[in-house]
């Protein structure tokens, strides 16, 4: 609208002060103003050109490929949910995996969806009936420890889901509330199911998983539903959290997380977010796709750049470090080389996220590659410093 007003005003000015007839004045004004969008396109074309870049599709697929068949993966935000849905709904990628967004899991309509079949994914193992989770019912359960002892997870969930008034009364509080009478819960691990989910590697497997709720005022509906799934599932289906999920959604299960790629698998051992090198190596080296960020000339905006640098740290460096600790130096070197191949410095500049890359190269005896990385980091930092010093105080 304002551009149109500007053209009209310029035409009027030419007509009045240039003594031009209306047709010529309008034509001249139009031609002159055409240079404005041409200039805008010329200056902004490069940083709006997404040709050759398929990061959203491929990175979304990578989350799904981090999971075992028939898995459940919990996500939280838009960027770790919508790309996964696109990959499944449009590209048909890993439709056996059920994506469950914890933000939506606070609503009854979404829980209804999760209890239905979706493609090859069976309904989620949720035992709560609709009248027990309908909106306005059990939206939260307060953590009110009436005992210092830990109680069984199943007992705690049955306590919350009961409609018996005696389970709603807290000493000293007149109002009836949904609550959990302990801040320490435990889940008994079925040894057969636990061994199966660990692939027969039972070293370190625990007989019960402790869930410490100390410091939490309440559990939301989504957390109660996740705990119900943990109890009901009995490790029949692999359960994962996307690595981008906020820790406050973990229900304090992160001590039992094992990284397999872009996801943490819930396992019956004190993994503490350690890397499962076998699974993660296979995913990173053989299954993951890179969205074209490895191609010369592909424009990478600040959001994609941030994700790529996170990949460098959370995937490649972490996996290589774990492989070095296990004495698998050849594989660690392959991982580092893969990192430099798919996240080339021309597209993803070297900065603090590459420090560990250089250190690991040095540990592996690749001093020239290490020096090249450290030199690249230093050069980029000096360019930044010089640019800052050009600014007036």
Task: Provide a role label for each language-model segment.
Residues 82-86:
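Phosphate- and divalent-cation-binding pockets in alpha/beta enzyme and binding domains
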């Amino acid at each position: 609208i304002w551009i149109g007003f500007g053209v009209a005003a310029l035409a009027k000015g030419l007509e009045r002060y240039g003594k031009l007839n209306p047709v010529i004045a309008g034509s001249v004004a139009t031609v002159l103003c055409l240079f404005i969008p041409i200039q805008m396109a010329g200056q902004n074309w490069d940083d709006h050109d997404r040709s050759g870049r398929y990061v959203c599709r491929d990175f979304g697929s990578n989350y799904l490929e981090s999971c075992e068949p028939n898995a459940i993966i919990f996500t939280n935000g838009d960027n770790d949910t919508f790309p996964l849905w696109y990959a499944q709904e449009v590209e048909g990628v890993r439709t056996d995996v059920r994506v469950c967004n914890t933000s939506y899991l606070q609503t009854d309509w979404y829980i209804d969806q999760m209890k239905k079949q979706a493609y090859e994914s069976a309904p989620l193992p949720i035992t709560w009936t609709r009248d027990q989770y309908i909106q306005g019912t059990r939206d939260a359960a307060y953590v009110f420890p009436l005992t210092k002892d830990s109680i069984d997870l199943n007992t705690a969930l049955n306590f919350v889901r009961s409609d018996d008034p005696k389970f709603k009364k807290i000493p000293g509080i007149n109002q009836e509330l949904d609550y959990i009478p302990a801040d320490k819960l435990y889940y008994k691990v079925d040894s057969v199911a636990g061994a199966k989910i660990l692939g027969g590697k039972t070293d370190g497997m625990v007989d019960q998983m402790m869930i410490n709720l100390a410091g939490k005022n309440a559990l939301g509906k989504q957390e109660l539903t996740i705990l119900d799934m943990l109890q009901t599932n009995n490790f029949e289906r692999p359960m994962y959290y996307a690595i981008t999920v906020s820790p406050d959604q973990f229900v304090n299960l992160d001590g039992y997380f094992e990284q397999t790629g872009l996801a943490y698998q819930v396992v019956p051992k004190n993994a503490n977010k350690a890397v499962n090198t076998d699974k993660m190596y296979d995913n990173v080296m053989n299954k993951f796709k890179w969205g074209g960020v490895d191609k010369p000339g592909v424009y990478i905006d600040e959001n994609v750049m941030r994700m790529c640098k996170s990949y460098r740290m959370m995937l490649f460096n972490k996996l290589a470090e774990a492989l070095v600790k296990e004495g698998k130096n050849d594989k660690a070197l392959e991982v580092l080389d893969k990192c430099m191949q798919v996240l080339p410095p021309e597209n993803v500049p070297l900065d603090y996220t590459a420090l560990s890359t250089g250190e690991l190269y040095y540990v592996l005896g690749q001093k020239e590659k290490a020096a090249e990385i450290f030199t690249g980091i230093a050069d980029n930092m000096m360019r930044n410093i010089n640019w800052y010093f050009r600014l007036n105080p």
